[in-house]
Amino acid sequence: MKLLFICSRNIWRSRTAEDLFKRRNGYDVRSAGTAASARIKVNQKLLIWADVIFVMEREHKKRLQEKFPLDIKSKEVIVLNIPDKYQYMDEKLVELLNDSVLPLLDKMNEDSE
C-alpha cells in the first residue's frame, strides 16, 4: 500500500510520519508539503501515486482540493488533526501518529482481505 503524508513544509510532521511508517513491511511511504517553501512540494505525480493520503490539518486537505481537485477526487484523504507544534521525531508526535494512523491501517488491511 502506498501512503503519502502531507503537512505544510515537509520538515517535521510529514517527514516524521514517512520515516516512522516506511519501517513497516507492506508500505511504500512518501511525504510532501503544501507550502511554496516545502522541502518536497506536493505535486500531481505524488497524488496519483498514493493509495491513501494523510494530511496533518484540515487546511492541507482544503489546499489539495483547491489545487488538485481531479487528482484527489477518487482518493481517500484522511485528516489527522495534528497541529504544527512538534519537531522531527518528537516523542509526542510519534505517539500521535501511531495512535491515529495504525488503527486506520489495520482497518484498511482487514477490509482488503
State the predicted function of each range.
Residues 9, 59-60, 83-86:
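Short, flexible active-site-adjacent loop segments at beta-strand->alpha-helix junctions, enriched
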Residues 59-68:
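Cofactor-cradling patches in redox/metallo enzymes
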Residues 67-113:
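Phosphate-binding/catalytic loops
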Residues 1-52, 62, 99-113:
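Conserved active-site segments centered on acidic
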